[in-house]
């Protein structure tokens, strides 16, 4: 057996970032990611096309566990579900006063 590794240390990704940095980046973007209908082709092995009809991904376990990546409804991995990214509503002052009278007619 080899030497014991410290599993509490941050594990870097291939690009050099850590899991904590990646999670912080997701929060900074203010985007909401939802996984919609399952697109897994259950009849691919026989040359057909059949989907199971699952309409939205529901995690079967708590966040951070392996079960969180499996859908409770259809049993498929999260990657089979269509990914939908929604940008959070930007805060803006929508009260514009355009009645300055300098526009063309």
Swiss-Prot record:
Q: Entry's Pfam families?
A: ZF-HD_dimer (PF04770)
Q: Which UniProt keywords apply?
A: Cytoplasm, Metal-binding, Zinc, Zinc-finger
Localization, UniProt: Cytoplasm
GO (cellular component) term, any one = nucleus
Q: Name one GO biological process term.
A: regulation of developmental process
Q: Does the keyword Chloroplast apply?
A: no
List the InterPro entries: ZF_HD_homeobox_Cys/His_dimer
Where is the stretch described as Disordered? 1-29
Gene Ontology MF annotations:
DNA-binding transcription factor activity; transcription cis-regulatory region binding; zinc ion binding
Give the stretches traversing the membrane. none
Q: Which domain of life is it from?
A: Eukaryota
**Positions of the zinc fingers (ZF-HD dimerization-type)?**
35-84
Known PROSITE patterns for this protein? ZF_HD_DIMER
Predominant localisation class: cytoplasm
> NCBIfam families this protein is in?
ZF_HD_prot_N
Subunit structure, briefly? Homo- and heterodimers.
Its annotated function is as follows: Inhibits zinc finger homeodomain (ZHD) transcription factors, by interacting with them to prevent both their nuclear localization and their DNA-binding properties.
Please state what the protein is called: Mini zinc finger protein 2
Q: What is the lineage of its organism?
A: Eukaryota, Viridiplantae, Streptophyta, Embryophyta, Tracheophyta
């Amino acid at each position: 057996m080899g030497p014991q590794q410290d599993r509490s240390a941050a594990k870097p990704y291939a690009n050099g970032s850590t899991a904590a940095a990646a999670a912080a980046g997701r929060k900074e973007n203010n985007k909401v990611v939802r996984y919609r209908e399952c697109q897994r082709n259950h009849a691919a092995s026989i040359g057909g096309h059949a989907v199971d009809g699952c309409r939205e991904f529901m995690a079967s376990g708590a966040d951070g566990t392996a079960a969180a990546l499996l859908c409770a409804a259809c049993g498929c991995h999260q990657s089979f579900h269509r990914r939908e990214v929604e940008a959070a509503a930007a805060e803006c002052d929508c009260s514009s006063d355009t009645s300055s009278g300098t526009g063309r007619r």
